Amino acid sequence: MQRLTQNTIEDIVNRSVNYKNMNNHNDLNINNKYKVLFVCLGNICRSPAAQGIFEHIVRENAMQDRIVADSAGIYGGHSGSHPDRRMRTAALYRGYGLSHSARQVRGYDFPEFDLIVAMDDQNYEDLMHLAPSVEDSHKIVRMASYLTEHKISYIPDPYYMGSEGFSLVLDLLEDGCRNLYESIVKTL
């Protein structure tokens, strides 16, 4: 597991500054929509699954014109990769297609998104260190805080857990995403 280093933080901040200087970001075409970013370590298991589940809920409720989601990882080593094959298979079995390409959290994600959802305590701490302002740090929440059917304080990384780990994570994310969606809709 990669810990954030000062060089990693500086790299992310520098990319943010370069982005602001370019002034042409429109990746998601999401002006005037509520924007949610799901974050895990590598953006190949938990966060793309959360994004897929959340987007499914948004579509079921015909709210695509009001709410959008994306996902990213603290670690950039998987950038450009598809979600883990085991997660894609487990998600597809439940009706969720995961077509996301992994990417690393970018400095400009903080002002761009309304809510940034961390999968575990380390992701949360890393995001808090990356947040460029106190205002941006208030957007960071733990996914586990939206769980109502499960008594667990974080979403575990299923990477080394076997097939039952992927199933557990999907159970947790379905619970959390459903409640997250409901809490967002109340604010719109």
Predicted features, each with a name:
Residues Q2-E112, E182-L188:
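Conserved active-site segments centered on acidic
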Residues R3-S16, L115, D121-L188:
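Phosphate-binding/catalytic loops
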Residues F38, V117-A118:
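Hydrophobic beta-strand core positions in alpha/beta domains
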Residues S47, D120-D121:
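Helix N-cap/beta->alpha junction signal
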